[in-house]
Amino acid sequence: MAVNYEAVIGLEAHVQVRTKSKMFCKCPNTHGAEPNTVLCPICMGYPGVLPTPNREAINKTVAAGLMCSCEIALKSKFDRKSYFYPDLVKNYQITQYDQPLCKNGKIHIHGTGFSGEPLPDKYIGMTRIHLEEDPGKSNHFGNCTGMDYNRSGIPLMEIVSEPDMRSADEAYAYLVALRQTMQYAGISDCDMEKGQMRFDVNISMRLRGETKLGTKVEIKNLNDS
């Protein structure tokens, strides 16, 4: 007899915030410029620079939280996340760890999924929305890789869902609803061809009816342009 398993899916959506300038400097928030031409000492992390938070990015992240029924923090802070990767020119990222701007939200899904099958009318929980800076971008040319740091420092929301989805259809419906919400509120263009909305997917399997989570597999950087 076949064992009845179910998928448990959670999503991390990375959404660029539509602002005039980058997160911590006055460089313009643009797309499509020649590589490594939209840079300054702050977004390159030169010694002695003093980053200043972008008020517009903070306000729009709070608006995103309100649109998703989140609790808005009365006190929040930024942290340095240190790691070494070619697209992270500073070798650290300014992000939020234990005090995000928004937490405990939800997104409503209903209707049909991409397969055409009807979806359950349900809410997908949202763990948190925190604000950070986007890293640079790797461009691959045959056997060579070039680094474009123009994207470095663009304000980026990381929107983390609860593991409440049970199918690819539900995950698709959640992302469609999230994208429509961000576009409607003017928070982001969510142009996936420009990398303005990207996803990491966390998937595990368990016997249907169980509550314990299984071993998680993470699929990173879906729809990264």
Model-derived features: positions:
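Basic, nucleic-acid-interacting segments
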Residues: 1-225
